[in-house]
Regions:
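Active-site rim beta-loop-alpha module in soluble metabolic enzymes
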Residues: 85-134
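Short acidic/polar active-site loop segments enriched in Thr and Asp
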Residues: 45-46, 137, 156
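Non-catalytic positions within long, well-ordered alpha-helices that form the structural scaffold/packing
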Residues: 40-41, 132, 151
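Flexible, glycine/charged-enriched surface loops at secondary-structure junctions
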Residues: 1-4, 106-113, 198-209
């Protein structure tokens, strides 16, 4: 069944015996939160975010894959769920499933933190330096809100990001580069594979001896 939430097309399919929803979300933390609230209300229990991010660690290059271990909130949505929390974390179990699936699919990746902002044109040198010191390697506009909503609603969430540009003295955009588009598709296929394999493994473990 194909339908829409907040003007975003939603595809539902069965993967590994489970119903899976895929939605192409709009840009930004508030949009991500609205999408998640709807999906969770419809019964979603595990969220995998596949996104694109700018690299602030210039050792990363367009097309590189980063599995998030945390996200610093510099946006206005997550504070409506948890006041005073600076860094949000993904759920451990789906993050492990995600990393295992990427390895099985031969997709090289690293782990790192994201800096999530509402103001991409205010990514100043001072802010970039601050978040680099804090441990962030990429910047995006959604991940901290994704983790915040998931934690508040008691569902699991993990995130994998593809580097789409490099934020430095000389901005290096590569949003529509072949390597970025190809890697996004590869990663999405790996996520779907992981959801199928991970759920099958959970069912095997749940069976009585």
């Amino acid at each position: 069944m194909d339908w829409y939430i907040y003007s975003n097309r939603l595809w539902t399919r069965r993967v590994g015996g489970r119903e899976v929803a895929i939605v192409h979300a709009l840009l930004g933390a508030s949009s991500a939160a609205m999408n998640l609230e709807e999906l969770i209300a419809y019964g979603a229990k595990r969220i995998y975010e596949v996104g694109v991010s700018g690299a602030i660690d210039t050792r990363l290059r367009p097309g590189d894959v980063v599995v998030l271990k945390g996200a610093f909130s510099d946006e206005g949505t997550s504070r409506h769920y948890f006041k005073g929390v600076r860094r949000f974390r993904p759920s451990l179990r789906p993050t492990r499933v995600l990393q295992a699936s990427l390895r099985e699919c031969g997709i090289e990746h690293v782990t790192g933190d994201a800096w999530t902002t509402d103001a991409p044109y205010r990514e100043t040198k001072r802010k970039v330096a601050r978040y680099l010191r804090a441990g962030a390697s990429i910047v995006n506009m959604e991940s901290s809100a994704v983790f915040a909503v998931a934690a508040y609603r008691s569902v699991e969430a993990a995130s994998v990001q593809i580097v789409s540009d490099v934020v430095s003295e000389h901005w290096e955009p590569a949003f529509h580069a072949e390597i970025v588009n190809r890697r996004r598709l590869d990663v999405l296929n790996a996520v779907l594979r992981g959801m199928s394999g991970g759920q099958a493994e959970e069912r095997r473990r749940a069976r009585p001896a």
